[in-house]
């Protein structure tokens, strides 16, 4: 068969395979859904979707040891090879190299090397380091069979309350553009090929300007608003991604309000997908919707309506038609290829339109070498994933990303009497004498996380939204501690926290974006150098946040610390 001959050009192989495929096989190719490494009770398995729905794109949730993941991948490839045409599986993943775990956005590093979150890479600001990270992550992904990265996330943090800030490179379009080029080149290389991990860059055309900072995973966050008239500004990082050759694009859930575009979610929006992405930018890669636009679901026991914002009145079948007519190729987080096939059978979607998307998806599979070398080596996976050089580089990035916002006593002297909160006392004992009460200490070290308002539902609870300010009781507790002993305050900036009273009373303030206790202590005791600069400004008050336009970077009045602030030694 021509499509199985690796000596032939990719275009010829694609043409041959498309001609052999049934409608059901084509439709199955265009759905890219979740598969658990260890499925929860009642979840449909990847194997059943390969056999029964002709699907072969799976977003992996969870994980095991590198060997176990590689063996699981190989078993899926064996299952796919036994199908009529033997179309191989493509596995994808959300980020899994940092400190945050959110089943809708990212996973803890686990066996993989552990790095700061993307704002930490932005705080360092080195394109060379970002490319190094991406290249190391690429090698770890390849080792276990992951061939598509559901990242980078290059939205601009122009609304500080937005819960997805910690997946971005911060507020600045120029910095984000510089880093995304390096990121894509590290994962994909100069040209996509058998050694690449394809990037699904998101969320086109920029997911930062969320009304009140609410996220469009949920109905109350469905609107994206542009009071500052900056719609075009949010496109700049995507222009850099196109220049770097991103293989795929994911539109966001949100619907634009008050722009020239139809007020429907971006995945249904023909003016955005066809008009902007396909025609203005001439993007001919894969466009995959964000997850769950078509059907309702239960996620972690929480009822989640389809994110069909602006088209809630349409049936699931009608939503499939509208998204496909808008110009998407694949449906993320869905497993209903029958709905697409029915529109082709009814003549509403032409075979030519269907085949255009099928060709894009197959072209990537062939280019990645999946038809010619679908299996991975479980022994090699155990050696590559989390190897010492990768772990060391990740740790060094953690220390470098730490951002010194205010300093008095640093570096601390070895053997100093320490009172610690939020820091492993046993680990801290290797640096100083840990004491049980602040009154006995020479200095206190306090680790805090950016505040948020807890939300109902097990799934929504992972999306830290609402106020960025500490409550009055916590401020009072911390300022009393600061009056008792000189206090070094470390704040994890998953969002741009508001903490003027705490900063004023602190002897030193250090920001982090995902760093271990050891990384923090190495910096506090002068064994490593903090090199970070803020990737987004820190507002002085919630009133300033609420008054700032959601689409304008650095729009809060008189920030506590401006974008780019950082005391370097």
Predicted regions and their residues:
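A glycine-rich phosphate-binding loop feature that marks nucleotide/adenosyl-phosphate handling sites
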Residues: 33-34, 95-96, 155-156, 199-207, ...
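Short acidic-aromatic active-site loops that bind/stabilize oxyanions
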Residues: 123-131, 227, 231, 387-394, ...
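Binuclear metal-dependent hydrolase catalytic cores centered on His/Asp/Glu-rich metal-binding motifs
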Residues: 211-231
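Short beta-alpha connecting loops at secondary-structure transitions
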Residues: 164, 220-226, 258-263, 297-328, ...
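N-terminal beta-rich core of secreted/periplasmic extracellular enzymes
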Residues: 1-205, 235-252, 265-336, 345-370, ...
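C-terminal non-catalytic regions of proteins with extracellular/luminal or membrane-system context
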Residues: 1-6, 12, 143, 263, ...
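A general structural motif
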Residues: 38-39, 228-235, 312, 422, ...
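Distinct, well-ordered alpha-helical segments
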Residues: 102-104, 212, 495-500
